[in-house]
Swiss-Prot record:
This is Protein TIC 214. Residues 1490-1517 are annotated as: Disordered. GO terms for biological process: protein transport. Belongs to the TIC214 family. PANTHER family: PROTEIN TIC 214 (PTHR33163:SF40), PROTEIN TIC 214-RELATED (PTHR33163). Pfam families: Ycf1 (PF05758). The chain crosses the membrane at residues 19-39, 68-88, 91-111, 133-153, 176-196, 227-247. It is a multi-pass membrane protein. GO terms for cellular component: chloroplast inner membrane. Keywords: Chloroplast, Membrane, Plastid, Plastid inner membrane, Protein transport, Transmembrane, Transmembrane helix, Transport.
């Protein structure tokens, strides 16, 4: 019962699933979704529902609904019915129908009585309103307009139609679903209307009920139809605005309509004239070609835009021929069979293109040009071609299926009805498919094994290596097509090569294939439709030599010219080109029929226009190759001719008799750009401007157009955002800078900016209006004539006549001289001066400026020259500012300093007169007051004299009075007289106080004497007391005097101290003021630094914390893992691979790298793996150089010996074996770890302890025990011998192409560890030939492939050793002015001829790969040496321009020897490396026996070296020229006739150093433009001295940038600083050869090893034999090993196969096609391995490190192999979308991020 229930339940579920997935349900669902695509047609339907009432309203509702449903039904039927779909889907039909109907409907609703025929009944047909409602809803439903932004809902039905088988049922069900949705929608609208009617709050609105607005409401109801029509019209206009206008469309001319391009559009037989139907080469080129009809007479070709096939319709009318070749009638008549469409083509095509040109540029796309490819492919062209194919044994839809093959299958099915493949079950097919792939792998493996076994048998190279196929167009000379044009190498080409002469390839290739019988196509009858037989023909043996090559040349090269061809020659030519012969098995006769010959190819929609921009038209560079009318809008610009050279420079011009060349003038022109915003932005004319990217404009004249995406990066307005940081900056700036002077300067700067902006606006305004330039130009010329010849002469006459009336001398001569000095120079619109008489070209339309030099200003009088001194004039100029002696004329006759600037203030004529009058009046006023001034002066003198006399008399009177008193005192008291006088004399000098005391005592004594004369005793006592007091006073005074003298002496000493301290204080004060003044800058600097540090700290907080966290966790985990391991470490050798240069950058930047090995780059992983122990490195060699699952068992014991000698193996590992792992190992190991997301412990176990410690270091620390001397200097010869193989095989490879695609394609052939060797293995080239063509010259860089990283070069000093010039002065003469073009190439190639003899004059390393990285990064570039040695400037500039051509030995060797500079240098040298005896003894201590045993080639002399290097350089340049695009070469050929040496030099410079950009110094831009303006004027003048001097004084012409020398050099320009050469930063693509070379060729040698060991190591070596491969490399074997000759030069054995087979071999090996279990192993493979005699024995006792390395190796190698496949899928699998390998990327990289 339970089983029955489950059975019923299962049936119900399956039934439900079937119902849900049925066509009906899906159609109902999609139809219901279509209802929500609401368009303008709903407006009519809703209007009929809402507005119309009554019986007529009901009929209108019914008709509207019926029309709406009928229109939708027609849309659904058009999906299924193709004619209706074409009618409704064509844009021009809808456009033609929509516009007239919209106009009719608009006028219908605006004119009410348009169809009013009076009183008619309701049901009569005269009343067309109901019919119009039906038509409105029907037609507007077909217009497919959408109000919603996306129309995806309406197109869902169209999309699902591609997946549905029962299409009619699906269309019906989808229509029913739409009808259900429509009914529901209309019911919902009805419910909303009922709700509105029932809701009183809406109906009882005050506005509606009020009487005031009743009239407005009624008018609104009456005019609803008009409102609806207006809304509908606006919607339709908006919709039509998104598409281009059908009539006023810019019609672009196709390439066939333009002259000079017909020859380019040849049939695609340039590389393969008759490609087979299945050849990929023909297919690739056929994709390019457009469909053309070729007329037989060669008159014209018609380019048809609809298809791109090549059709040839011919009717061959001949008589049957017998088998033996007897001709009955040999006349062949060719005539064109016209189709029916050709009769009305002249009418139909112009009408269609008038309405809508479907091939023009509708979208405003960018037109990306390509000089080497013709018309570009349309963007809407899908690169995919879908067809069914077998993949994994099952039928699948392939998106890259070859379209030719699908077309072929379709044709076969039509011709052979039984051509149907029986479908078999999927499992047998799948197994069969996998078996086929397995069989392919086995066959490839067997072939590979056979070729390797042939190596042991010492076969020749030709029998071992698989040949690659190249396209040869000259077998005799072995000339091949360039790799970029080789279809075998380049792959699919999407463009046609320009101007390849097709007759060369046709004549040479066809001659080879057609000397026998004509081409017979066996399956031709199956593919072509044969309707009737016209004639019979036998196989004709014809010789192609009988064809006239001259006729072929004329036929192909000049198709435009009419040419008569004889009938026989015409027969032969077209028989040669178009005969196709068919075979019949039953009949001996051959039938030639009317043939429709279709080239089976893919339709590639290609733009039929080859457009040029307006700027290119203005420049006029490509007038021969481009149409006359530009198709791309450029920035608004005008071509202004500034100089026209009417006299030819060379005699070539005089000999030309061509009318075009004779009429053509040599013009020099400048492009004047408009200053307003460039809104056109290189869009193509006729494209929809409204569909361009939206741009934000907030100013009327805006400098640049900004996208909304980047608008936030601009300075916003205040209402857009509030920038707090900007406000802080402004506040700080205002706070720090409060200087008034700087504020004034800022205001002046802002004012000048505003003035400049105003001038630009005025100029653009004049340039934008129609006829404005004509009006302005005529006004300017009128003002110039009026000023020069009417106004100024009239003013001169009036002035001089007035002077004569005032009885003054007239100044006719001075005024006329100034008037004649004034010059009116005609200038272009932007101010370039021409001359007085020459007007600019098209000056009425382009604009004109008139510049007045030395303008005339009327002066009332002229001063003499000696009146105003020079100092006064200088002072005036300093005060008033420098005043220019020129101006520009305005429209109103005013003068401005700059065009469109504000008017200048003229020097006033009345102002000097008024100043002179003021002076005269002032003088007149001062005369009456002159007497008073003199009297006043005399009165002051008299008063001074009287005052002095008065003082003198008073002094004398007092003196006499004093004398009288003294005499009286002496007579009365004689005893006291002398003492008083003495006292007075003493005290007068000492102090005033003592004098006062003595005077008082004397007065008291006199008074006492007068009153008491009788008392003698009292007198005596008084006298005694007086004497005592006087003596006491004298003693006190003497003591005080002594104290005063002592104090004075002390004060003098202290005064010096005070003065010195005062000086110190003054200096301190001065320093303090300076410190205060400068503290502002210091505070500002500190604030800025602090803010930056805070900002960076905030940013880096998260990163620092996470980094510290992960580092701490890693350290803890590492300690935990290795806690129990052995700590003791043995001293092992280190093998450092000098790996890819990007690793050096990575280490020098001191970046810390985590253990996430999947996320590391492949180069870094290999570099770090090289630092493991020697025992592990031996296994790494197997990983790096051999494929894991196949080639490892080919490793023999001799290779181990070789590695042991190199220090890669230890001696104990001599008998150990390589590990032979399979691809399944890494799969099994990775299956256990989901998505490689391993824990930290598992990741850490993959690496050794020493590697773990190394990887956590900040930078690479070199081992101090390893010295550069051991690694380079002591092993120079050994390295030479070790590198002999690599140089002989890898350096001689042909140069890669310069094109990016070709380099990618070649890189696909190489893969990681593989190198593409040359097939030619001859070792006849000497070793010296390889010196110039070094690894640095390999094309490892995209685009040029010759530049190596500059950081390896020690460019502190450039030292040169001149082999053939003893004295440097006559060779490099800095003062000579010879033509530089002749000596440039020779001088610049001297750097290639540098020998290694005297590379260093000091003890400095010229090159240092180990230690120069950090030093060069911090090294300052100085050129002070060149000031004293100008001879070296040439070589220094040489290195700057061409740093990549450096011999390889200079990078591998260091020279630390001191060479005496004063020692006499001789030219004779015994060998290449010998510079002196000491050096040769030290480095090359080799005996003759050793040289003979090694078989080393003796180094050649310097002459041969020089010749070899020159030949290598010439070959290099030849290859570069060969790989260069032929179109550019032809363009260059057209311009080879240079008019001057400067032009030739510039062309040579740009061709040789095109990867270095030549940039002006930014400071010279304005100076150069100013100089050009002055030059244009000076060239036209006969005596330009005066104007030249004045322009120099004004600063218009700068003398520092003048090229005084006629033949200047680029080195001089760089020395002056005018030109700056900047190398373009190109990405490096590392070559596999370089990796192997650095891995094996260079290895460090331990310092403890003796020199004897180094010299003895390579005593036994093999000799070179040109016939065998094993002699191309010198073997390195020990004494104990027998000298057995085996072949080990193929480090990657896969190189035996061709690149194509090599790729297939790798893919089959990397992907295992069998479904195996996790532990399944390939038993057959193991069995084969054990049977081989060279298999290395395995051992079970693997140590821990070996097991870890096995896991690491099995994980890394296939992982990165998949990465390479993912990167190269574009070229291997013909897919350009990288997302196809997204799943691989997901599984390759772990989830946790890198910190």
């Amino acid at each position: 019962m339970m089983v029955f229930q489950s059975f019923i339940l299962g049936n119900l579920v399956s039934l439900c699933m079937k119902i849900i997935n049925s066509v009906v349900v899906v159609g109902l669902y999609y139809g219901f979704l279509t209802t929500f695509s609401i368009g303008p047609s709903y407006l009519f339907l809703l209007r009929a529902r809402v507005m119309d009432e009554g019986e007529e309203g009901t009929e209108k509702k019914v008709s509207a609904t019926t029309g709406f449903i009928a229109g939708q039904l027609m849309m659904f039927i058009s999906i299924y019915y193709a004619p209706l779909h074409l009618a409704l889907g064509r844009p021009h039909t809808i456009t033609v129908l929509a516009l007239p109907y919209l106009l009719f409907h608009f006028f219908w609703n605006n004119h009410k009585h348009f169809f009013d025929y009076g009183s008619t009944t309701r049901n009569e047909m005269r009343n067309l309103r109901i019919q119009c409602v039906f038509l409105n809803n029907l037609i507007f439903q077909l217009f497919n307009h959408f109000i919603l932004p996306s129309s995806m809902l309406a197109r869902l039905v169209n999309i699902y139609m591609f997946r549905c088988n029962n299409k009619m049922l699906f269309v019906t069900s989808s229509f029913v679903g739409w009808l259900i949705g429509h009914i529901l929608f209309m019911k919902w609208v009805g419910l909303v209307l009922v709700w509105i009617q029932q809701n009183n709050s809406i109906r009882s609105n005050v506005l509606i009920r009020s009487n005031k607005y009743k009239f407005l409401v009624s008018e609104l109801r009456n005019s609803m139809a008009r409102i609806f029509s207006i809304l509908l019209f606006i919607t339709c206009v908006y919709y039509l605005g998104r598409i281009p206008s059908p009539i006023f469309t810019k019609k672009l001319k196709g390439t066939s309509e333009t002259g000079g391009t017909k020859q380019d559009q040849e049939v695609s037989t340039e590389e393969a004239p008759f490609p087979s139907l299945f050849s990929e080469e023909g297919e690739d080129l056929d994709k390019i070609d457009e469909m053309e009809e070729i007329r037989v007479n060669g008159k014209d070709k018609i380019n048809k835009d609809d298809e791109f096939h090549v059709r040839t319709y011919y009717n061959y009318k001949t008589v049957s021929e017998n088998v033996d070749g007897n001709k009955e009638n040999s006349n062949l008549e060719f005539f064109k069979i016209k189709k029916k469409e050709d009769h009305f083509l002249w009418f139909e095509k112009p009408f269609v293109t008038l309405v809508f040109d479907y091939k023009r540029w509708n979208r405003p796309n960018r037109y990306i040009k390509n000089d080497k490819i013709e018309n570009t492919v349309r963007n809407e062209m899908s690169q995919y071609f879908f067809y069914t194919c077998q993949s994994d044994g099952k039928e699948r839809i392939s998106f890259t299926y070859p379209p030719t093959l699908s077309t072929f299958f379709e044709m076969i099915k039509k011709k052979i009805p039984s051509f149907t493949r029986e479908k078999t079950p999927s499992d047998p097919i799948s197994t069969y498919w996998s078996l086929i792939n397995e069989e392919k792998k086995e066959n490839l493996k067997k072939e590979f094994l056979n070729r390797i076994e042939a190596l042991d048998k010492e076969w020749s190279v030709e029998n071992i290596l698989e040949k690659t196929t190249r396209f040869c167009h000259n077998e005799a000379k072995k000339e091949y097509l360039p790799k970029i044009y080789d279809p075998f190498l380049h792959g699919i080409s999407r463009g046609r090569i320009k101007k390849l002469p097709p007759f060369q390839i046709i004549t040479q290739t066809y001659r080879k294939n057609n000397i026998g019988a004509s081409w017979i196509n066996k399956i031709h009858g199956l593919l072509l439709k044969i309707n009737y037989h016209k004639f019979e023909q036998t196989i004709e043996k014809f010789n192609s030599k009988s064809l006239s090559i001259e006729k072929k040349l004329s036929f192909f090269s000049e198709p435009q010219q009419e040419e008569k061809i004889d009938s026989e020659e015409e027969i032969k030519i077209f028989k040669f080109l178009f005969d196709v012969v068919r075979t019949h098995s039953n009949d001996q006769t051959r039938i030639k029929n009317f043939i429709d010959f279709y080239e089976i190819n893919k339709k590639v929609p290609r733009w039929s226009y080859k457009l040029i921009s307006e700027l290119e038209e203005l420049e006029g560079e490509n007038e021969e190759n481009v149409p006359m009318e530009p198709g791309i809008r450029s920035r608004k610009a005008k071509r202004v001719v500034i100089f026209t050279d009417k006299e030819p420079h060379n005699e070539i011009y005089t000999n030309l008799k061509d009318n075009q060349n004779s009429d053509q003038k040599d013009e020099m022109a400048l492009i004047r750009y408009s200053q307003q915003s460039d809104f056109r932005r290189e869009i193509i004319k006729g494209s929809m401007r409204s569909q361009r990217r939206k741009s934000i404009i907030w100013e009327f004249f805006q400098a640049k157009v900004h996208s909304p995406l980047f608008f936030d990066r601009k300075d916003k307005l205040f209402f857009f955002s509030f920038d707090i940081w900007g406000l802080k900056k402004k506040i700080l700036r205002n706070f720090m800078w409060k200087n008034k002077k700087k504020k004034i300067d800022k205001k002046e700067e802002e004012q000048s900016k505003i003035e400049e902006k105003r001038r630009i606006e005025i100029a653009e305004t004049w340039d934008s209006f129609l006829f404005a330039q004509i009006i302005r130009g005529s006004l300017l010329v009128t003002q110039s004539i009026l000023r020069k010849y009417i106004i100024l002469p009239l003013l001169i006459i009036i002035k001089n006549s007035v002077r004569m009336l005032l009885f003054q001398f007239p100044e006719w001569s001075e005024d006329l001289k100034d008037w004649k000095r004034e010059m009116h120079i005609k200038c272009t619109y932007n101010g370039v001066q021409l001359s007085e008489t020459e007007f600019p070209k098209n000056w009425l339309t382009d604009g004109i400026q008139i510049k007045i030099l030395f303008p005339f200003y009327l002066k009332p009088w002229h001063k003499s020259k000696f009146q105003a001194s020079q100092k006064v004039r200088l002072k005036k100029t300093k005060d008033k500012g420098e005043k220019n002696d020129f101006c520009f004329l305005t429209v109103w006759g005013m003068e401005t300093e700059l065009p469109f600037g504000s008017a200048q203030k003229k020097p006033s004529f009345v102002e000097p007169i008024s100043k002179e009058l003021k002076k005269r009046i002032k003088k007149f006023k001062t005369k009456p007051f002159l007497v008073l001034r003199i009297f006043k002066k005399r009165a002051t003198i008299l008063l001074k004299v009287t005052k002095e006399m008065k003082n003198w008399t008073l002094k004398n009177f007092l003196f006499i009075k004093g004398k009288i008193k003294d005499l009286s005192k002496q007579n009365l008291i004689p005893l006291f007289g002398p003492s008083e006088i003495y006292e007075l004399n003493e005290t007068k000098k000492d102090s005033i106080i003592s004098n006062q005391i003595i005077h008082q005592l004397s007065v008291q004594n006199k008074s006492m004497e007068w009153t008491n004369s009788s008392l003698s005793e009292k007198k005596k006592k008084n006298l005694i007391d007086r004497i005592k007091t006087i003596r006491n006073k004298i003693d006190e005074i003497s003591k005080e005097k002594q104290n005063l003298t002592n104090s004075c002496t002390k004060l003098r000493y202290d005064s010096k101290i005070i003065e010195s301290s005062k000086k110190i204080w003054q200096t301190f004060k001065r320093k303090n003021t300076r410190l205060i003044r400068k503290s502002i800058f210091f505070i500002k600097f500190c604030i800025e630094q602090l803010s930056i540090a805070i900002f960076l700290g905030i940013i880096n907080i998260q990163r620092i914390t996470t980094q510290l966290f992960f580092e701490s966790t890693k350290i803890i985990l590492d300690k935990y893992i290795y806690k129990n391991d052995e700590i003791g470490e043995k001293k092992n050798k280190k093998n450092t691979i000098y790996f890819i240069s990007t690793i050096k950058n990575l280490i020098s930047n001191k970046k810390k790298i985590s253990y996430d090995l999947c996320s590391l780059s492949q180069a870094y992983v290999f570099y770090k793996l090289s630092q493991i122990k020697i025992s592990n490195f031996s296994k790494l060699k197997a990983v790096l150089e051999y494929n894991i699952c196949i080639t490892s068992f080919f490793v023999k014991n001799q290779i181990k010996v070789f590695f042991q000698e190199q220090g890669i193996f230890q001696y104990e590992l001599k008998n150990k074996t390589f590990l032979n792992s399979e691809v399944n190992q890494w799969k099994n190991w990775l299956r256990s770890h989901y998505q490689y997301n391993l824990p930290q412990i598992a990741w850490a176990r993959l690496v050794t302890e020493k590697w773990k410690k190394k990887i956590t270091q900040d930078s690479l620390v070199l081992n101090p025990s390893l010295t550069k001397e051991d690694s380079y200097e002591k092993k120079i010869v050994d390295n030479y011998k070790k590198q002999n193989f690599f140089e002989a095989n890898s350096l001689v490879t042909p140069k890669h192409n310069l094109k990016k695609d070709s380099i990618y394609n070649i890189f696909c052939y190489k893969s990681i560890h593989c190198t593409e060797k040359n097939v030619d293995m001859s070792i006849s080239i000497a070793l010296d030939n390889c010196l110039v063509s070094s690894f640095l010259e390999k094309y490892n860089i995209r685009g040029i492939g010759e530049i190596q990283y500059r950081k390896y070069l020690d460019w502190r000093i450039l030292n040169f050793w001149f082999t053939k010039k003893v004295n440097i002065e006559p060779w490099v003469d800095t003062k000579s002015k010879q033509k530089y073009i002749n000596t440039k190439v020779q001088n610049y190639q001297r750097i290639d001829k540098i020998t290694k003899t005297g590379l260093a004059n000091q003890k400095r390393n010229f090159f240092d790969w180990m230690g120069m990285n950090e030093e060069i990064l911090n090294h300052r570039i100085t050129n002070f040496e060149f000031v004293f040695f100008p001879e070296f400037v040439l070589f220094s500039s040489t290195y700057k321009m061409k740093p990549w051509v450096i011999p390889i030995k200079l990078l591998l060797l260091n020279f630390n020897e001191n060479i005496n500079v004063n020692k006499k240098i001789t030219r004779k040298k015994k060998g290449f490396i010998q510079s002196n005896e000491k050096k040769s003894r030290r480095f090359y201590n080799l005996n003759k026996d050793e040289k003979e045993s090694t078989g080393q080639v003796e180094f050649e002399s310097d002459k041969e070296q020089q010749r070899n290097s020159e030949s290598a350089l010439s070959n290099q340049e030849k290859n570069i020229e060969e790989n260069y695009a032929e179109s550019t070469i032809k363009k260059r050929k057209n311009k080879k006739q240079y008019k001057s040496n400067t032009e030739a030099e510039l062309d040579l410079f740009l061709t040789r150093y095109s990867r270095f950009q030549l940039r002006w110094n930014c400071f010279f831009n304005q100076k150069i433009l100013d100089n050009v303006k002055v030059y244009c004027l000076l060239v036209r003048l006969k005596n330009p001295n005066e104007i030249a001097i004045s322009s120099i004084e004004r600063g218009e012409m700068s003398l520092d940038i003048l090229m005084i020398e006629k033949n200047f050099t680029f080195a001089k320009l760089m020395k002056k600083g005018i030109l700056i050469i900047e190398p373009v930063r190109l990405s490096v693509q590392n070559d596999g050869q370089l990796i192997i070379y650095r891995t094996i060729g260079i290895s460090l040698v331990h310092k403890n090893k003796n020199k004897d060991k180094i010299s003895k190591r390579y005593k036994k070596k093999s000799y070179i034999d040109k016939k065998k491969i094993d002699k191309s490399i010198t073997k390195y074997q020990n004494k104990t090993v027998n000298r057995k000759k085996n072949n080990y030069d193929f480090f990657v054995p896969e190189n035996i196969l061709s690149p194509k087979r090599r790729r297939e071999f790798r893919i089959l090996i990397c992907f295992n096609f069998k479904k195996k279990t996790a532990r399944d192993r390939n038993s057959r493979f193991d069995k084969n391995i054990q049977n081989l005699p060279t298999v290395l024995h395995k051992k079970k006792d693997l140590d821990k490190d070996k097991k870890n390395l096995i896991n690491l190796k099995s994980f890394l190698w296939p992982n990165f192999r998949l990465e390479d496949l993912a990167c190269m899928n574009r070229y291997w699998f013909n897919t350009t979308n990288g997302n196809h390998f997204s799943m691989i990327r997901i599984h390759m990289y772990t989830r946790f991020p890198i910190h």
